[in-house]
């Protein structure tokens, strides 16, 4: 494993406070993951996921429901949040670990981000990217992703 890849994975783990494969993340008292999931690929790397507004939002939960990453390329999701008619506010970057396992990721929200999460019609914007900027995404990678705002 290259030093840059190890550093990228370590940074992601610190930002997330850890992540756990198989959807066994930290339990929350929040609403369920959005009933709408999206598929991300190298050909269609970005998507918007409508989520329910949550008062006193503390985090954004991203569920990687399924993942096909046979090449085991290091990948990340660039995540932002916006409300109807608003500008996207970056939330953070996270990725699955191991890189070919479904995962539950949790990104903390600042008070300014939480205000955006109150709506109207908030949505999470996700972008699939290579963990190493100089390496293009493998065209065979496919992720199915859902999201929820948590209190």
Per-region residue spans from a language model:
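Short, surface-exposed tryptophan/glycine-enriched loops
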Residues: 98-123, 131-137
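Solvent-exposed serine/threonine-rich low-complexity stretches and specific carbohydrate-binding patches
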Residues: 28-38, 87-102
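C-terminal motif of bacterial Sec signal peptides marking the signal peptidase cleavage site
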Residues: 15-18
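Bacterial signal peptide processing site
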Residues: 20-22
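Contiguous beta-strand segments within globular domains
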Residues: 39-63
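Exposed low-complexity, polar/acidic, P/S/T/G-rich flexible segments that act as propeptides
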Residues: 59-62, 67, 129-151
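Bacterial N-terminal signal peptides that target proteins for export
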Residues: 1-8
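Short coil-to-beta strand junction motifs in C2/discoidin
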Residues: 70-78
């Amino acid at each position: 494993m290259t030093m840059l890849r190890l550093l990228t994975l370590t940074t992601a783990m610190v930002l997330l406070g850890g992540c756990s494969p198989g959807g066994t993340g930290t339990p929350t008292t929040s609403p369920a993951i959005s009933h709408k999931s999206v598929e991300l690929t190298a050909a269609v790397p970005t998507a918007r996921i409508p989520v329910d507004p949550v008062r006193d939002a503390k985090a954004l939960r991203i569920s990687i429901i399924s993942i096909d990453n046979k090449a085991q390329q290091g990948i990340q999701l660039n995540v932002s949040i916006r409300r109807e008619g608003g500008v996207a506010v970056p939330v953070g970057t996270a990725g699955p670990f191991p890189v070919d396992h479904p995962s539950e990721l949790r990104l903390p929200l600042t008070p300014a981000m939480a205000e955006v999460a109150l709506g109207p019609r908030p949505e999470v914007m996700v972008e699939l990217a290579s963990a190493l900027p100089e390496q293009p995404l493998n065209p065979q990678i496919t992720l199915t992703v859902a999201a929820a705002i948590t209190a």
